[in-house]
């Protein structure tokens, strides 16, 4: 990956129209809705782009809540019977030109680090995502590799507890 690429908030100079990925819905979202939803504070769109505005990948983060009854039993245990505050990893995509270079793992790691940092300011007990119907099995495998668990109520939705993210980040800090 070119060193000129970095994580940025979506801006006007980013060339959304050039983005092509395996999921049509993820591609269309970036072109047609991302700027509007970012501007009206519905989500935050983070792009991995170079200085020329070329987007190699992107993800969105926003606030969410999950009903306790929708969570796996091991997560429900010991929790108050209130909705669980969470961070929604709403959209996630890698441009076809940048596939098979480890960018998906890099972007997911950046999304988790950003979600964890935000959870220190505004409580969030978990990260939740929905796998797009037209997403590849590779996407699902990537999420499972990072520890995401399918929700019993909807197997297209997956959850990762923030405590797991914290443990993984602490482990990485100890290794450095």
Q: Model features per residue range: what roles?
A:
Residues 1-101, 105-140, 144-176:
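Non-catalytic substrate-recognition and accessory regions of acyl/acetyltransferase enzymes
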